[in-house]
Amino acid sequence: CGKPTVFRIIHPNLRENVICANCRSINRQRQIAHVMLSNIHGGKPPATARIGEFPKDKVVWNLETTRALHDHLKARIGDNYIASEFIDPSMKSGDTRDGIMHVDLQDTHFADDSIDFIVHGDILEHMPWPEKAVVEMFRVLKPGGRTIFTVPFYRHRFTNEKRAVVDDGAEGGVRHILPELYHDDPMRPQDGVLVYNIFAPELLCDMEKAGFLPRLCQVYSPFYGILGDNGIVIDAVKPAAGQSM
């Protein structure tokens, strides 16, 4: 929000707390906002930068319809802002339920070259086919557009960790390779959502193969309430003609 504040730490996982007393944003959301602002301020946002000053002419798709980043982007961007959730696998991308749009990042309904920024926080690990999601993001982004997101990320290994796969012959249609792991999910507060993958630098190679110019950002800024050693944000651009990182 960019306002003077106090950050509250309520449990040891700094990535999921360090809560702003004003806007209720958490550490991980501010990491994404910081990288978004860095891209419009030539690499380093000024101390007073806030997401409420993001350019209104940019089409931004956020894969979340709750929490502080959504609230700020919706208030700022208006009609150019798109927010969605993964609601039900039986729904088609673009369908709505209770006023919320359902979109499967692995199979979206958006037109080619139609979006400037795609942002999401800890979403990709819940998709059984993340490589399809990477291809879809590249397809719908405009040349020069970017996807900025967080995922659980290993720094001690190169390859992604496959924890579960879709298998019609398995109980529940999912075969678990490693012990089941679930994350909290505002859409499914009782059940949570299954983790299919935990990522590693291999993800950036997969994004390069899809055509992206990706970079791994390590974000740390006590001034912005971005604490801890796990401030990892992926920032990947769909290059315009002649564009480089």
Task: Give the positions of each predicted feature.
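S-adenosyl-L-methionine-dependent methyltransferase catalytic module, highlighting the catalytic core
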Residues: 131-244
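Glycine/Thr-rich phosphate-binding loops of Rossmann-like dinucleotide-binding domains
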Residues: 70, 128, 157
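Active-site micro-motifs of SAM-dependent methyltransferase domains
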Residues: 107, 125, 155
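GHKL-family ATP-binding catalytic core of two-component histidine kinases
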Residues: 109-111, 128, 200
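Conserved N-terminal segment of class I S-adenosyl-L-methionine
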Residues: 1-107, 164-168, 222-245
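A short acidic, Gly/Pro-enriched loop at the edge of an enzyme's catalytic core
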Residues: 103-118
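Residues that mark the start of a beta-strand
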Residues: 57-60, 114, 142
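A short SAM/SAH-binding and catalytic strip from SAM-dependent methyltransferases
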Residues: 116-128
